[in-house]
Amino acid sequence: LAALPTVMELKSHFDGADVLVVSPGPSLKQDLELLSEVQDQFLIFASVKALSALFDAGIKPDLAIWQDPRDHSHAIPDRPEIAEVGLVLSEGCHPAFFGANFATHFPYPDPGFVGTELSAALHGGDAPKLGGTSVSTLSAVMALGFNARSVTLLGQDLSIGGGLYVSGGS
């Protein structure tokens, strides 16, 4: 972890930006065409599970995010495009995510350790508590904590009965 850049290094990218948080809900499919036309107007922060759908539509997210500590390496797209996208991830994510071929990896401070010497050594003394029960919640909290001008959510309908991820998987 000490050899990786911290998510705190991204703060200036969020400051004053219009952030689009993209999740892989089935409604994302209807927004892909419009998103491809306006993608340059947003900092696009996407769930790893939304990446393939975005790449297929010609959309290049600025950042991807993952927070689950379990081995979900099957969720990492086997696509060359990930080499151009930075990955924001929990300090406790499975090693497969740290080893994936993303442009770089930006661990975020574990809320339970913020304020400790370990957190200060990894992220500096002013790291905010970044938390959320889903990657979309965490992404929105992070964007707002880093002074984004606005946060817009797409593809957030994962709890609708019968809905599948836009990539077609479960």
Model-identified regions with their sequence ranges:
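N-terminal donor/sugar-recognition subdomains of glycan-related enzymes
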Residues: 1-22, 26-43, 52-57, 72-85, ...
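Structural motif
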Residues: 19-23, 44-46, 65, 88, ...
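Active-site/ligand-binding-proximal alpha/beta "capping" segment
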Residues: 95-158
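Glycine-rich phosphate/pyrophosphate-binding loops
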Residues: 48-68, 146-166
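Gly/Ser/Thr-rich loops at beta-strand to alpha-helix junctions
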Residues: 24-28, 51, 133, 158-161
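Acidic, Ser/Thr-rich peripheral helices and adjacent loops at domain boundaries
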Residues: 65-71, 76-85, 106-110, 166-170
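Short, acidic/turn-prone active-site loops that include or flank metal/cofactor-
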Residues: 48-51, 66-73, 90-94, 110-114, ...
